[in-house]
């Protein structure tokens, strides 16, 4: 039988508080127009909606932040049915969570939230915006929804979010290194998609990487309000929202960008700029790659011959293979909470007070880490666009 307890009473003894709501509510999205925003200070997020998909490995990674045992006092808060589901699931792990925080949102304790929670939008918010309903954190002016992908136009035609445009990453990258195109070419691409600096752009993709890559490039260009659908296309489908088919509707081109381009050049580092960070104690070159890539066992790419790592780089984690970013994702493919990512990076002495340059092979995984850090409120961050691919071609870097 669940036992109600106030937050102050529960905290008189060491224990763990778990928020069983979805990550959007935990991060700070109100559950109603102008409603309460955030989560109990120090609470951990274990959403009931994850349980059917959460593997043992994912739970081990989740619990590594603060290991739990059969003796750990655990209290839950959220919807009653979610609390019951999480309690039953934890019981299978021989963990006991009989307490319920009765005053999670009515006590005097301040709530915490992700500083940039509005940058990661939930599917329900986007659906309401498209339907012209009132929403929290509404875009100030013109907004557009864009699906990002590489060679995915036919897939887009088969099904996409109603009203969405399609932007292929091939329009934004140039061979041979797949770095961002020159400023004038970038200006032309954005104009063709009707994007000005004051356009709110809401991005999604079939996997997390394409949306993150385009989001970073748009921010570098100077688009002021760039948001990403947290959980991507999968989140939209799982919510059962409408799906359109066919080509994107015609887009009215923008006459001008409305600002110098790039307006945020510091977000995209060149090879000399990346090299200059290596000898600075207040900076980190952060490799967002698999351990096999970071340790030099493989390059990760069939078109990159050299194996190894930038000397002095720190491992920012990634996942399995060149497209893997599991270390940053919840079981439902939403981004992990700030406490988890912060602890993951602190283990490699990667902290918010440093000048951070994320990189990977060619910029995609690094962009996801950038989007994550940006939402966490980290400010002195950028992406070394050339990554290991460019670095490995310059032997004098060694």
Describe the role of every protein-language-model region.
Residues 1-398:
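Cytosolic catalytic domains that perform sulfur/thiol-centered chemistry
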């Amino acid at each position: 039988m669940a036992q109600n307890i106030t937050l102050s009473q529960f905290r008189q003894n060491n224990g763990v508080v778990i928020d069983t709501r979805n990550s959007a509510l935990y991060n700070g999205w109100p559950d109603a127009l102008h409603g309460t925003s955030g989560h109990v200070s120090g609470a951990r997020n274990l959403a009931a909606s994850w349980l059917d998909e959460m593997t043992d490995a994912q739970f081990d990674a989740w619990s590594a932040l603060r290991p739990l045992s059969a003796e750990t006092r655990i209290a839950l808060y959220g919807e009653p049915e979610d609390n019951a589901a999480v309690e039953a699931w934890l019981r299978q792990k021989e963990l006991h969570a009989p307490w319920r925080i009765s005053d999670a949102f009515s006590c005097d304790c301040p709530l915490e939230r992700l500083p940039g929670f509005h940058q990661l939008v939930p599917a329900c918010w986007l659906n309401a915006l498209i339907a012209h309903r009132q929403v929290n954190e509404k875009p100030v002016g013109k907004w557009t929804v864009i699906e990002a992908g590489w060679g995915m136009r036919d897939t887009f035609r088969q099904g996409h979010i109603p009203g969405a445009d399609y932007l292929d990453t091939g329009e934004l990258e140039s061979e041979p290194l797949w770095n961002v195109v020159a400023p004038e070419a970038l200006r032309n691409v954005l104009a063709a998609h009707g994007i000005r600096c004051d356009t709110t752009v809401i991005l999604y993709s079939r996997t997390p990487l394409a949306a993150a890559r385009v989001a970073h490039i748009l921010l570098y260009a100077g688009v002021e309000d760039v948001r990403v659908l947290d959980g991507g296309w999968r989140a939209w489908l799982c919510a059962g929202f409408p799906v359109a088919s066919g080509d994107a509707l015609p887009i009215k081109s923008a006459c001008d960008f409305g600002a110098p381009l790039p307006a945020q050049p510091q977000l995209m580092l060149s090879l000399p700029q990346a090299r200059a960070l290596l000898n600075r104690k207040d900076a980190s070159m952060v490799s967002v790659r698999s351990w096999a890539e970071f340790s030099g066992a493989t390059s990760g790419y069939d078109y990159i011959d050299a194996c190894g790592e930038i000397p002095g780089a720190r491992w920012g984690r990634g996942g399995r293979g060149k497209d893997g970013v599991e270390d940053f994702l919840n079981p439902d493919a939403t981004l992990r909470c700030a406490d988890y990512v912060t602890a993951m990076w602190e283990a490699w002495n990667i902290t918010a007070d440093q000048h951070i340059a994320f990189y990977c092979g060619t910029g995609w995984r690094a962009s996801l880490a950038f989007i994550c850090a940006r939402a966490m409120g980290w400010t002195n961050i950028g992406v070394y666009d050339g990554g290991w691919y460019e670095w490995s071609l310059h032997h004098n870097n060694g």
